[in-house]
Curated annotation (Swiss-Prot):
Belongs to the mannitol dehydrogenase family. UxaB subfamily. HAMAP family: Altron_oxidoreduct. Its EC number is 1.1.1.58. GO terms for biological process: D-galacturonate catabolic process; mannitol catabolic process. The keyword NADP does not apply. This is Altronate oxidoreductase. It comes from Citrobacter koseri (strain ATCC BAA-895 / CDC 4225-83 / SGSC4696).
Amino acid sequence: MKTLNRRDFPGASYPERIIQFGEGNFLRAFVDWQVDLLNEHTDLNAGVVIVRPIESTFPPSLSTQDGLYTTIIRGLNEKGEAVSDARLIRSVNREISVYDNYDEFLKLAHNPDMRFVFSNTTEAGISYHAGDAFDDAPAVSYPAKLTRLLFERYTCFDGALDKGWIIIPCELIDYNGEALRELVLRYAQEWNLSAAFVQWLDQANTFCSTLVDRIVTGYPRDEVTQLEAELGYHDAFLDTAEHFYLFVIQGPKKVASELRLDKYPLNVLIVDDIKPYKERKVAILNGAHTALVPVAFQAGLDTVGEAMNDRDICAFVEKAIYEEIIPVLDLPRDELMSFASAVTGRFQNPYIKHQLLSIALNGMTKFRTRILPQLLAGQQVSGVLPARLTFALAALTAFYRGERRGETYPLQDDAHWIERYQQLWHQHSDGLISTQDLVHAVLAVDAHWGQNLTHVAGLVEQVTTDLDAILTKGMREAVKPLC
């Protein structure tokens, strides 16, 4: 069986116009996949050079396959049908290591056609590294590497204003473009680079903040033999992802036309402020996950897919989204409804086995950031506690017993919470404290919740009622009235 390469698998190739920091699965199934579609359907005509930003030889370089690889996009489509689509990606030209080929890295700035910089260097990537110097070959941090490359660009083209870049980071931090810009300016100042360069940074370059959303499951290790037999070639860089994707870019409208989104619309939004879209994702997608996990797991289920195929649990989650989360969010209702519909479809994806226990990681913090704002807003708007979000808090409290049907399971959270729950549940089982005492102790920790939740009218009482129902009837019976 032949391995992918451009000689044996000839096809379109594109001039290099995009620099991409990061060689991982996510960018290849998200950015490079979208660029490939735009190349096919518009005159974007943009090839990608991947820059490996870390000193590592694993995985091997994508250049071993001449930049070619296959994405397999699978999940439920808009009609709820299971679909699987294999696509040979031709948008990537090559990969270079900034550690092994530093001069080649700097030469990227000499190409007059270079226009875009994308990156995903993990959440820790957009950070300051003390000691990074201009003459390092390379500097350690991504922002320092980018600063050096931008200075090379500025110098090569004598500060021409039409030779700046549109810089679009995809790292999962708030306002990632603004954070990256601040660090580039910090290094420029620290390295005593000219005021003219700093002015060029500001006038010629656009730093965009983003929200990225797609579950990328990467290399399908357990299915490789079957998939390669279907494809008819060997691909060491197979990349699988869900059908859904969303790319929100905070930036000027010209970004849409430069990416040719006006000629072939993808699920990419160019917006003035990313904040409401982040709130939507956190509240609906992440919030539904967080509400679902303790309820579904204690009902005897193990994966998100199993939960969404369970009539009662699915109804509980959907009612939480549509009746309690969406009404308190500040975005057009049709956008929220459309996003919510996509979320429930994503949860039902038969190709993704999403373990509930893995999502349960750091559940206390997740509840505070993802559900509590909607719970409190719902009470303020209607004067009534949202029944399902409140029940989810009771279910979370029960989850931290660490036992299901007589078997223990691992709890992954801050040591403080694990120890505190262990103490409280022991006292409860020994009859030393009541259920209400236990609930009061959990809700009173204002250092965690940001306020003392025992002061929220009726919350202690309702969580206690729900928790008692879970303890006496079991999760299935306790949740039924809310389904």
